[in-house]
Amino acid sequence: METIAKHRYARTSAQKARLVADLIRGKKVAQALEILTFTNKKAAALVKKVLESAIANAEHNDGADIDDLKVAKIFVDEGPSMKRVMPRAKGRADRILKRTSHITVVVSDR
């Protein structure tokens, strides 16, 4: 049984979150949580929270056994970017892109 959890509009760039997602793809959830706990990245905390949500969804909604679950799929898509302005010298301005991403985790007992 596949169970999904999503975090939409996460305040990190998709490029940075994908580095973390690649670490846990295909792993058992216990091992994935351990890896995320000791990964020193902001995105690791965000991905860990989504993974914990997916585990809880599988247990509550589908009655799955946690020991059998593994990360079947995990992917990070780009969300909308917030455009901001940073003033520079001599009346100029630079545009700052505050990027967001959509983190999706699918756990399965197969």
From Swiss-Prot:
Assembly and partners are described as:
Part of the 50S ribosomal subunit.
What is the originating organism of this protein? Haemophilus influenzae (strain ATCC 51907 / DSM 11121 / KW20 / Rd)
Which Gene3D superfamilies did the record assign?
Ribosomal protein L22/L17
UniProt effect for mutating G91D: In strain: S2 and S3; confers macrolide resistance
Annotated InterPro entries: Ribosomal_uL22, Ribosomal_uL22_bac/chlpt-type, Ribosomal_uL22_bac/org-type, Ribosomal_uL22_CS, Ribosomal_uL22_sf
Q: Which UniProt key words apply to this protein?
A: Antibiotic resistance, Ribonucleoprotein, Ribosomal protein, RNA-binding, rRNA-binding
Q: What is this protein called?
A: Large ribosomal subunit protein uL22
Instruction: Provide GO CC annotations from the record.
Output: cytosolic large ribosomal subunit
Give one GO biological process term.
translation
PROSITE patterns according to UniProt? RIBOSOMAL_L22
Recorded GO MF terms: rRNA binding; structural constituent of ribosome
